[in-house]
């Protein structure tokens, strides 16, 4: 199904934004290498432009890429009935557009929460998402944000097919164990032995980096390094789905590596706590950047 596309270019870096589908950065290509995940059903998602009340609905509308989950994240609840937040799939309004930058706006159905977000390609090698959330209502509101930044495509698949895999450089942080739905669990958390080197044998797994000392994670493939840095978000979720899940809709075909800065170190949603209480007129501002550099020894 077609959706209006905005193409941004900065030298060797090309990004495509879909305003009608959560303002998602649906693809990012650097020097001919596609970096962001793309689902097998990306050409025929269901009911695009609508928020989802369940994980199954959300996944069926997800083409892949990088989008903002807001003003809630993770599982739905009575206070926030949308999986991954109402803004993650619904249309945004374009307010500014140039060759390397687009600015967009979104407001909640009750107009209480207003989000201003921009995508900008920088120096032919970086993309930056800058976001400001404002509570325009008369009462305080709990807010959760997550950058649903999912690497995949050639960046991941070529590394897996070569046998070298993808390695991660992680900051010092507390690791928190989560189940595959993102819910906290008493299991021993996966630490460096799982996340430092990812291959076809890596199980489907989710972990949280709680209060990292440095807000930076690098993913290394044989061709390039993608370094994600962020500010205004205290934690990050890590998600690996490298063909390990064989049940529908994954069918062993989805290659996704999530590095997801977030306000909240779990996927339990507003009902699970961990949101930021925004009073009337208060704002929350965040910045997340993905920088592409050649792998060591590459020009």
Q: Predicted segments — roles?
A:
Residues 1, 9, 76-124:
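Extended, loop-rich substrate-binding clefts of extracytoplasmic carbohydrate-active enzymes
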Residues 49-91, 281:
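Extended, compositionally biased flexible segments
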Residues 8, 24, 106-153:
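Acidic, contiguous internal or C-terminal segments within carbohydrate-active enzymes
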Residues 82-97, 202-273:
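Acidic/His-leaning functional-site neighborhoods
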């Amino acid at each position: 199904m077609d959706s209006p596309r905005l193409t941004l270019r900065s030298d060797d870096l090309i990004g495509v934004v879909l305003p009608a589908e959560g303002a998602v950065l649906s693809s990012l290509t650097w020097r001919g290498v596609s970096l962001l995940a793309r689902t097998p059903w990306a050409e025929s998602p269901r009911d695009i432009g609508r928020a989802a009340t369940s994980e199954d609905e959300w996944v069926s509308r997800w083409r892949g890429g990088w989008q903002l989950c807001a003003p809630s994240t993770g599982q739905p609840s009575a206070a926030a009935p949308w999986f991954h937040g109402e803004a993650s799939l619904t249309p945004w309004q374009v307010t500014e557009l140039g060759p390397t930058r687009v600015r967009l706006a979104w407001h909640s159905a009750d107009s209480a929460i207003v989000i201003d977000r921009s995508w900008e390609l920088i120096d032919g090698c970086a993309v930056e998402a800058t976001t400001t959330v404002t509570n325009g209502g008369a009462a305080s509101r709990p807010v959760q944000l997550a950058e649903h930044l999912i690497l995949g495509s050639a960046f991941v698949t070529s590394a897996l097919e070569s046998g070298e895999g993808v390695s991660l450089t992680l900051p010092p942080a507390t690791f928190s164990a989560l189940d595959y739905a993102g819910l906290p669990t008493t299991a021993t958390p996966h630490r460096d032995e799982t996340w430092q080197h990812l291959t076809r044998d890596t199980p489907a797994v989710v972990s949280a980096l709680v209060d990292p000392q440095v807000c930076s994670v690098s993913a290394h493939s044989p061709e390039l390094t993608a370094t994600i840095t962020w500010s205004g978000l205290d934690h990050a979720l890590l998600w690996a789905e490298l063909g390990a899940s064989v049940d529908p809709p994954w069918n062993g075909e989805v290659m996704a590596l999530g590095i997801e800065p977030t306000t909240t170190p779990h996927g339990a949603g507003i009902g699970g706590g961990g949101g930021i209480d925004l009073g009337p007129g208060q704002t929350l501002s965040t910045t997340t950047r993905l920088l592409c550099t050649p792998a060591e020894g590459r020009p």
